[in-house]
């Protein structure tokens, strides 16, 4: 964990692996296709219960930088708003995290839902070899969606570290926004540093995205929280990585914000996929 902040830091499959995901979940209220593509096939779930589900509607690598760097994106289903899922750090393999889940299949049966692999994860190209900040990551996602011809409005849903990305995207692109969901996202720390947790240094081998996590994410958002006009749902898991009180800090990001508590662990979308999907669809209709 990161200095007591509750974020697991490790690789998929390790004891402290961080399989972070983005979802919206049902609970008890407790507070306030396109261009530049190199398409690649993939094995995807084809059923939701006994109902057939169509193959991906977007599936490929899309150019996000002038030097030719590409990120991998997959979308399923049709409809609007589009739900964009963002996983945590350092496990930025959103497609692997979300693709083979009942939660994702339920969403795709009702609207378009997209997941992507951030830089140096899955089938995406390596990140530039320099410190990267929140603007860099949001620019990657914005360019990726544009290159793939995936239009808004969007519901940005991010778990743990991915929630910071979702909230900052919302701050930067309010006109493309239908809502934001934060799943078990601890409040940012104003003091977290690489001296305390060496693995979050931008050039540490455990940080292949080269994200400058201390000053450019944790400290930045603790001192200047993202702000946006769209509805915000803060999900706190009863067995998750941070308390209800801690995560209430995110509520100031939107005037239309509330917090819910869901029984489950950090990956609560796996514990209650039907409830998670139902709550997302409720937000889409607002």
For the regions a protein language model found, what residue spans apply to each?
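C-terminal region of N-terminal signal peptides and the immediate post-cleavage residues
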Residues: 26-52
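Active-site loop/oxyanion-hole signature of alpha/beta-hydrolase fold enzymes
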Residues: 115-155
